[in-house]
A protein has these predicted regions:
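A short alpha-helical element within helix-turn-helix/winged-helix DNA-binding domains
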Residues: 35-46
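Helix-turn-helix DNA-binding helix
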Residues: 20, 51-52
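Short, Lys/Arg-enriched N-terminal segment that forms or immediately precedes the first helix
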Residues: 1-12
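A short, conserved structural fragment
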Residues: 60-68
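Short, cationic-aromatic polyanion-contact patches
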Residues: 14-17, 31, 70-82
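Pre-recognition alpha-helix immediately N-terminal to the DNA-recognition helix
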Residues: 19-26
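Short, hydrophobic-biased segments on the C-terminal half of alpha helices
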Residues: 56-57
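Short helix-capping/hinge SLiMs at alpha-helix to coil transitions
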Residues: 26-32
Length: 82
């Protein structure tokens, strides 16, 4: 049996990626700015900022968001989940 590489499917988000993506949208809607990595870590119950960084990287690679690394909380939603 082969491995399941759903996280590499460029057309869809994994359940955890979708959970983070929806959190970003709701947080932005309620606060008019994006959450910090610490906020995301708490929401996703992840102990390391590297886990959030990696998950955001895959969501960006799939074309749902754009990160602007030189600015704090600079994440732009590019498209909605179908």
């Amino acid at each position: 049996m082969g491995r399941n590489y759903k996280w590499l499917d460029k057309d869809m988000l994994t359940p955890r990626q979708l959970k983070l993506f929806n959190y970003l949208k709701e947080y932005k809607k309620e606060n008019n700015y994006m959450p910090t990595y610490k906020d995301m870590m708490k929401y996703m119950n992840i102990k390391s900022s590297h886990g959030i960084h990696q998950m955001l990287g895959y969501i960006e690679w799939k074309g749902y968001i754009k990160k602007y690394p030189a600015m704090a909380r600079a994440i732009e939603i590019l498209k909605e989940v179908a």
